[in-house]
């Protein structure tokens, strides 16, 4: 009879080896994903490193800086000249920017959830963050317009017909009058009535 009892003793051995193996690989990342809602952003962190704020050049004028400081002080609920990381996105939007949450996290240095709720930033540190977001918006606008105009670039040579561009400017989006269109297109058409739309866009966005 004792030999027959040896067989069941081996049964736990099989699953005891396979179970830890199955848990060990996904265990750590899965636990983090459940514990921290920000974990799904981890891949983005590796692809988009934090912005180097020391290289950001402040381009705001004096009036803008005064307006920004006043708004910053309204968000300072403690009165120590600082606001929480978690308030930065809302303040940026209140100041006319429209950054995504990912963009806000990027300029903040990709902080963890706990840091968003505990770390604070003063106005001088916040300013280059706001500037970085503003420049990123301008670049995004350029890329969006460029992509839209490529639809009319039938030859793929970086040019569109002036007539088509006139039609777009007077009928789509924030419609322009014919006089306004002629003003912005002045000097951009070549002898064939075509316009280099990349140069045209850079000119328009610099106005």
From Swiss-Prot:
Q: Give this protein's Gene Ontology molecular function annotations.
A: calcium ion binding; cytoskeletal motor activity; structural constituent of muscle
| Keyword Repeat carried by entry | yes
Gene3D superfamilies for the chain: EF-hand
Q: Which cysteines are joined by disulfide bonds?
A: none
Q: Which UniProt keywords apply?
A: Motor protein, Muscle protein, Myosin, Repeat
Residue ranges annotated as compositionally biased, kind Low complexity, are 36-50
Every copy of the EF-hand domain together lies at 63-98, 140-175, 175-207
User: Which InterPro entries does its entry note?
Assistant: CALM/Myosin/TropC-like (IPR050230), EF-hand-dom_pair (IPR011992), EF_hand_dom (IPR002048)
Q: Which GO terms describe its biological process?
A: muscle contraction; muscle filament sliding; skeletal muscle tissue development
Q: How does it assemble?
A: Myosin is a hexamer of 2 heavy chains and 4 light chains.
Q: Which PANTHER family match?
A: MYOSIN LIGHT CHAIN 1, 3 (PTHR23048), MYOSIN LIGHT CHAIN 6B (PTHR23048:SF5)
Record's function text: Regulatory light chain of myosin. Does not bind calcium.
Q: What is this protein called?
A: Myosin light chain 6B
Species = Mus musculus (Mouse)
């Amino acid at each position: 009879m004792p030999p027959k009892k040896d067989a069941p003793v081996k049964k736990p051995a099989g699953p005891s080896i396979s179970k830890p193996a199955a848990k060990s690989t996904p265990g750590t990342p899965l636990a983090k994903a459940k514990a921290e809602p920000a974990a799904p952003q981890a891949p983005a962190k590796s692809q988009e490193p934090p912005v180097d704020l020391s290289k950001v050049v402040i381009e705001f004028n004096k009036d803008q800086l005064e307006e920004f400081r006043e708004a910053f002080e309204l968000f300072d609920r403690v009165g120590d000249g600082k606001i929480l990381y978690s308030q930065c996105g809302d303040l940026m939007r209140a100041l006319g920017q429209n950054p995504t949450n990912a963009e806000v996290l990027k300029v903040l240095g990709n902080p963890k959830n706990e840091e968003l709720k505990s770390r604070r930033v003063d106005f001088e540190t916040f300013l280059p963050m706001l500037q970085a977001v503003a420049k990123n918006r301008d670049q995004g606008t350029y890329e969006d317009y460029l992509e839209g105009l490529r639809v009319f670039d039938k030859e793929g040579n970086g040019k569109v017909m002036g007539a088509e561009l006139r039609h777009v400017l007077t009928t789509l989006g924030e419609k322009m009058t014919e006089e306004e269109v002629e003003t912005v297109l002045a000097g951009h058409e070549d002898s064939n009535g075509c316009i280099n739309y990349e140069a045209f866009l850079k000119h328009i966005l610099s106005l």
